């Protein structure tokens, strides 16, 4: 039996017969059952809310944070998630359904050919197991705050959002955090604007809101022990040591932190930036230190060290610098190298777990030239599929080398902005065994799939890359296909999507509707006004080869007719990637 026939994509009447969920059609991942708790849900963008999505996705995939949020406080009654987790069916007329079906057939024909294989060797099975016109979507609506004994606030909405995804039977789909966005804008004036906001500022606001809500709740319930799990996970202790150069007395002062904001320099690494963070500072002249032993102002040496290491280390790279001339912030496109493993050496002598090893868990990437424009995406390490890119509704597996594109040394405007490192001794056992303790090596494809995999690779026009990394416990189907996945189209897609967030009055859907109605010349004129940097550089995104030919410009790929745009947008669709389709107006 061929691979395509086994998957039900090349057999007669395969589109008409009733199918079970598409997961049943795939080989089971070669991992233990408890690791199947991963959920891969993209979040709907409600107009420049990608800064929210990137933070929520990153925190959700930090298992200690997600589990603590779902567990505290325990509901007095089982929360009613029926109104929260639903499958949405969009009724359509027969003519509209026929038109969309024909358009989809034309699109798949150009993407996958007659055998269902695209040029990258990826099989399109994103709709396997779903009924016609139906995609799994979670709409988080009415709050279950009464079950938690709280008033509706950011914390209860976040708890509803995470619980609805965790409790959902389907592992893949789209989540619409509508109520969370409404309450966020209701309770905080800074986030009511449709302008792009800073993801790090939102992260700090979210942690503070969660902490304040829990303090208030457990303050009113003195009979229940306050777990203080936010501080338990993120809190560390900094020690400011000041050494008098006259008597050599050392004065120490401790302060807590939930994240570290570090200054950056060009052509350095995160470890080097942390060393600079703890570098010595001379206190002299007008900045002399008052020594309690000398009883006078003395020259002194001051430095910051880490006394207590957090379980989850959040690092904020300070890429935005205030420009007094322009009275605004400029982005620093410095090259900052970060690694999957890191150990901090800027600790005090009496520090707890001074030799603690950290592993990279999530990266929030900013695409754009300033803090209030551009786009945010997140890349997280998962137990099942390794590294996964979350770009609003789009969910795509990527290999480990893909992270190197965000060091800041590539053409384009995408750079790592916030890094989340998890301590090795705090990681879940199955995560440690899969992603950290074992070296990443090519997985062995089961014998019954070897011949079929060879056939798929022969059909592909793109040769298999020898540098592609597959994960030892990745789903065999995804491993065999993602190894041939082209990141160039993904890079260009992120680049083009980021510019939809530059102008608050112009969202992606309105842009597409205007592009369809306009003539090609009008579209190009409008493109130059909204994409000035791309028009000047005419370069591929993330370090692709530059071209001087206008026909190779990303603009030629970005602004097409409706059907052509959909083709380019979904040309890199992987088996379980979901994205919201946009309708014409």
From Swiss-Prot:
Keywords: Cytoplasm, Hydrolase, Nucleus, Phosphoprotein, Protease, Thiol protease, Ubl conjugation pathway. Ubiquitin C-terminal hydrolase involved in regulating actin dynamics and/or endocytosis at cell tips and septa. Residues 1-23, 85-110, 447-473, 511-530, 540-585 are annotated as: Disordered. Belongs to the peptidase C19 family. GO terms for molecular function: cysteine-type deubiquitinase activity; metal-dependent deubiquitinase activity. GO terms for biological process: endocytosis; protein deubiquitination; proteolysis; regulation of protein stability. The modification Phosphoserine is found at residues 505, 549. The active site is at 50 (nucleophile), 375 (proton acceptor). Residues 553-570 have a biased composition (Basic and acidic residues). Its main location: nucleus. PROSITE patterns: USP_2 (PS00973), USP_3 (PS50235). Its EC number is 3.4.19.12. Interacts with bun107 and bun62. CDD domains: Peptidase_C19G. It catalyses: Thiol-dependent hydrolysis of ester, thioester, amide, peptide and isopeptide bonds formed by the C-terminal Gly of ubiquitin (a 76-residue protein attached to proteins as an intracellular targeting signal). This is Probable ubiquitin carboxyl-terminal hydrolase 9. Residues 41-424 form the USP domain. It is an enzyme of class 3 (hydrolase). It is found in: Nucleus; Cytoplasm; Cell tip.
């Amino acid at each position: 039996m061929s691979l395509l026939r086994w998957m039900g994509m090349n057999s007669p009447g395969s589109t008409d017969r009733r199918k079970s969920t598409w997961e049943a059609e795939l080989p089971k991942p070669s991992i233990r059952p408890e690791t199947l708790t991963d959920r891969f849900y993209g979040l709907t963008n409600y107009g420049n809310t990608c800064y929210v999505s990137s933070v929520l996705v990153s925190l959700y995939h930090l298992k200690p944070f997600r589990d603590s949020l779902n567990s505290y406080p325990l509901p007095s009654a089982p929360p009613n998630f029926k109104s929260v987790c639903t499958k949405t069916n969009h009724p359509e007329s027969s003519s509209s359904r026929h038109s969309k079906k024909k358009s989809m057939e034309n699109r798949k024909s150009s993407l996958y050919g007659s055998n269902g294989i695209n040029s990258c060797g990826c099989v399109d099975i994103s709709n396997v197991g779903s009924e016609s016109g139906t995609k799994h979507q979670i709409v988080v609506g009415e709050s279950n705050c009464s079950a938690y004994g709280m008033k509706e606030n950011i914390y209860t909405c976040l708890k509803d959002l995470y619980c609805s995804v965790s409790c959902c039977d389907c592992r893949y789909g789209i989540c619409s955090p509508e109520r969370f966005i409404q309450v966020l804008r209701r309770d905080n004036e800074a986030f009511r604007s449709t302008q792009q906001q800073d993801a790090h500022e939102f992260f700090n606001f979210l942690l503070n809101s969660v902490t304040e809500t829990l303090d208030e709740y457990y303050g009113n319930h003195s009979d229940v022990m306050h777990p203080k799990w936010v501080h338990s996970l993120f809190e560390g202790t900094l020690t400011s040591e000041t050494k008098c150069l006259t008597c050599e007395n050392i004065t120490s002062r401790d302060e807590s932190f939930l994240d570290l904001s570090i200054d950056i320099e060009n052509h350095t690494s995160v470890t080097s930036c942390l060393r600079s963070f703890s570098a010595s500072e001379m206190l002299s002249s007008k900045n002399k230190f008052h020594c309690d032993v000398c009883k006078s102002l003395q020259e002194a040496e001051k430095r910051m060290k880490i006394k207590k290491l957090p379980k989850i280390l959040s690092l904020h790279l300070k890429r935005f610098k205030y420009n007094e001339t322009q009275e605004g912030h400029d982005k620093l496109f410095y090259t900052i190298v970060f690694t999957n493993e890191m150990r901090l050496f800027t600790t005090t002598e009496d520090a707890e777990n001074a030799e603690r090893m950290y592993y990279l868990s999530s990266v929030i990437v900013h695409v754009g030239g300033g803090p209030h424009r551009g786009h945010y995406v997140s890349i997280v390490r998962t137990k099942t599929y390794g590294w996964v890119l979350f770009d609003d509704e789009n969910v795509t597996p990527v290999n480990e080398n893909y992270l190197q594109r965000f060091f800041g040394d590539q053409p384009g405007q995408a750079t790592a902005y916030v890094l989340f490192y998890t301590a090795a001794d705090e990681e879940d056992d199955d995560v440690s065994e899969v992603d950290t303790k074992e070296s990443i090596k090519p997985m062995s494809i089961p014998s019954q799939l070897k011949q079929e995999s060879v056939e798929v690779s022969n059909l592909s026009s793109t040769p298999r890359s020898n540098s592609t990394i597959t994960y030892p416990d990745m789903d065999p189907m995804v491993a065999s296909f993602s190894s041939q996945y082209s990141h160039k189209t993904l890079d260009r897609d992120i680049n083009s999507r980021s510019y939809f967030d530059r102008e608050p009055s112009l969202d992606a859907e309105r842009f597409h509707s205007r592009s369809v109605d306009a003539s090609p010349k009008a579209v190009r004129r409008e493109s130059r006004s909204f994409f000035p940097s791309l028009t000047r550089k005419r370069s591929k995104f993330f370090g692709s080869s530059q071209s001087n030919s206008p026909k190779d410009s990303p603009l030629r790929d970005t602004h097409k007719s409706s059907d052509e745009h959909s083709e380019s947008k979904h040309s890199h669709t992987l088996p379980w990637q979901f994205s919201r389709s946009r309708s014409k107006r």
